[in-house]
């Protein structure tokens, strides 16, 4: 789990940061499908399905792959650069979401 965070250039949390946004994996889809956060904030990927998912982003600026995420688990990812990032599941290729990161 350390590798995805290093790939994103993880930033230390600060007192002024917003609470993390949650993107759930439910019924073989992401919910919500779009979130907007600021640079340095986290998105928590939560698996609410009864089976595993593999959440990743192929974007050059924000490559991460959290590996197999078991049912009932949460994995935080900090986004360190601005941009729009497509989020996908390697196990279920039709699952897609978008994280927009602003300055």
Name these PLM-found stretches:
Residues 5-103:
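Extracytoplasmic copper-binding redox domains, predominantly the cupredoxin/blue-copper superfamily
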Residues 1-3:
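Bacterial N-terminal signal peptides that target proteins for export
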């Amino acid at each position: 789990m350390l590798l995805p965070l290093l790939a994103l250039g993880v930033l230390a949390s600060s007192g002024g940061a917003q609470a993390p946004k949650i993107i759930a994996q439910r019924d073989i889809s992401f919910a919500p499908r779009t979130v907007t956060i600021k640079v340095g904030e986290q998105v928590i990927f939560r698996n609410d399905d009864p089976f595993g998912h593999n959440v990743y982003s192929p974007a050059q600026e924000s490559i991460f792959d959290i590996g197999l995420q078991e049912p009932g688990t949460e994995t935080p990812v900090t986004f360190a650069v601005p941009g729009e990032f497509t989020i996908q599941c390697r196990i279920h290729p039709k699952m897609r979401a978008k994280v927009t990161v602003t300055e």
